[in-house]
Amino acid sequence: MKPSLSILSTVTGGALLFAAGITSVNAADNWSFPVEVWKPAFDMASPRSKMDYTPLAKASKPWNICVSFPHMKDAYWSAVNYGVADEAKRLGVKMQLVEAGGYTNLNKQISQIEDCVAGGAKAVVIGAISFAGLNNMVKEVRAKGIPVIDVINGMSSKELSAKSLVSFGEMGFKAGEYVARMHPAGSKPVKVAWFPGPPGAGWVEAGNAGFQKAVKGSAIQVAETKYGDTGKEVQLKLIEDTLQAHPDVKYIIGTAVTAEAAVGLLRARGLSDQIKIMSYYFTPGVFRGIKRGRIMAAPTDSTVIQGRVAIDQAVRILEGKDYQKHVGPKLYMIDGKNVGSFDRNSALAPDGFKPTFTVN
C-alpha cells in the first residue's frame, strides 16, 4: 500500500491529450485524464509533474466506501456526485453518500462520517466543510486503519491517506489574472466585487489568496470582499447589498452560485451591459452563461475527474496496490473563444443526472 508513479505515464502535447483524456472518460470500461502530481504530497507549494492518470479496471471485491459532501445544493457537487457514483459502479464497489446540508454544519458532517464508519465503511472520501475542523475525526478514523481521501475542498490533516483535488489558490489566481490582463497597471481603475464563498473553508481561503495576488498591481480595485454560504439566496443577498453600497462596480466575480445569481439580477435591473460576471470554478449554469455571453469566463477543475480519482485511490489503498498520493486535474480557462469546443464530460454531470446517494 505505497504511493507510486507507476500508475501514471508522462503526458506530452497538452491540449491534444486534454481532449483525448476527456474523450476516454466516456468509455464504458475505462478512462484516462491529464493530471498534475504534487511531490512531496500534501503541500500545494510542492513541485508538480504532468501525468496521465489511469484507474484500475475493476476492484477485487465490493468494498464499502463512504462519501461525505458539505451539501448537494448546487450543480458543482452534483458533478462530483456523478464522478464518485459512476466510478463506484465502474469499479464494482459499494458507495454511500451523506451530505451535511451546508457549510455551517461542521458538527453534522463529523457525526455523519462517524455513523458511516460505525456502519462498516472500509474507506472514507471527504469533501470537507472546514480546512482544519475535521482533523481530530480524521485522526480517529485513520487510527482504525480506515483510509481517508480528501476530495475537492482540502484539509490540513497530516493523517490523510491521499488527496484528489486541485489548487483553489490557482483557480482564484486564474480568474484574477484573466481580468487583470484586461486592466493592466496604468490603465483606468476598475472596481470589482469579489465573492469567494463560505468563510473558513480551505478552498475559499486559498481561492481568495490567489485572486488577490493576481489582481495586485493591476488597475483592478477590489471594492468589496463578501463571504457567505453557496446557497443561491445567500449569494443573491450579498450581491444586492454590494450593488447598493458600490453602484459603480464593473465586475462581479466569485463562486459559480454568485455568477449564476448575478445573471438574473443584472438582467432584471438592466445592468447586464454595464457589469460583467465571472466565476472561479465551473458548473452547468456557468457553462450555459458563457455559451450565451452572459458570463465572461471561468476556470474548470474537471470536477467529475476529481470524484473518480478519489474512489480509485480508495480502492487502490484498500487492495494494497500502488496509488498516487496527491493528484489533481490540470486547470483550464473556459471563455467565449473555446466554450464551443469544450467537452463537458470531465466537469459536468450528464443532463438529467439525479443525486445518487447509494451504489450497491
For each predicted feature, which ranges?
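Hydrophobic alpha-helical segments within soluble ligand-binding/sensing domains
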Residues: 48, 52, 109, 164-190, ...
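An alpha-beta-alpha
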Residues: 65, 69, 84, 173-220, ...
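Extracytoplasmic "Venus flytrap"
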Residues: 36-54, 64-83, 87, 91, ...
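Hinge/cleft segment of the Venus flytrap/periplasmic-binding protein
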Residues: 28-63, 195, 199, 215, ...
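Exported/periplasmic ABC-transporter solute-binding proteins
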Residues: 248-251, 263-330, 334-343
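Gram-negative bacterial Sec-dependent N-terminal signal peptides
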Residues: 2-25
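Flexible loop/hinge segments that line or gate small-molecule binding clefts
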Residues: 29, 131-170, 181, 191, ...
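Hydrophobic alpha-helical
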Residues: 123-143, 211, 228-289
